[in-house]
């Protein structure tokens, strides 16, 4: 059966990781994960992902070490779907697959961009055109594009059109026509020039965000047991490969199995380096390079990280130079902090590491959880562990809280607050402490 086959593969794989001497806590975690996977009906899903990764490894395709919550699965680690030991790095299985949240697991696979087609071809050859398809995606009419299209339909010449387009203020992120109108005096003058201009702008606002064209999702592939044509509308894509007529979100809501194959240029570079070394008689496995390698850490300390995935921007290089990371954990923390929201804590993290600011914890019981990050909340796993330790949440309950916080779901956050405080009081915490900690993690 699928259950027995997955169990056999995972057990054998984990034994290889530990030279046939599996520590007790790893065996316990593996058994727990396999039980949850089976109870949720996902044995076949893991076998499908294992199979394609096994193919990639068999033809020397360099794959990523693991992305997102899938790195929290010891089964994934045992099957070589990921290369990250979740127990060593305190990664939580419940963040990936939560029995309290009936949802398909989501494993994204990183593949070199110059060999992604080989993997896609393998999937279609294995499962057939009736059971696999790429996914449709829509390009929508953003502010400038919709304004340009409407100007053309209204018969404006190029000079007039670009007057309208130049009136849209520059913005780092996406800007709507309504926001542009509020910010741009020039746009306000154009709109109010005459009645036709008002109609033109109103028409553009009406059409904004509607689909303009369709293309193929850059990464997603759908696989089904039954014939896909019986489940979802299909159309022919490039080279005759079928494409769903439903978008990624709709495909997921139908409960279809979706796997993302992400083509990364950085893995192509890495694969080329490994191949060049092999040609010179040097056999190297990037996954076996020690994470405390001093020469590599020195590169990060200098911010010398061109072509290093997610460390290429000038901003993150400056953070690396200021932090002067002396461990792999420091590098991981920078990657987690360098994004909107958590960026506010970068200075605290740097100053505390260098002893310029006192390390503080919302409650002494959190030192074990926040100690490696100098009292700064960096990872979503830390939110889950805090809810477990301070308020007695199960990790499944803690994951639901984490999701509400990451999606800024105010109703759920407020509802969980009362539950958190009540649980903390039952464990002997003071109400003021519980409130302080909840406000900190929320």
Kindly label every feature range from the protein language model.
Residues 1-442:
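Alpha-helical scaffold/interaction cores of sigma-54-like transcription cofactors
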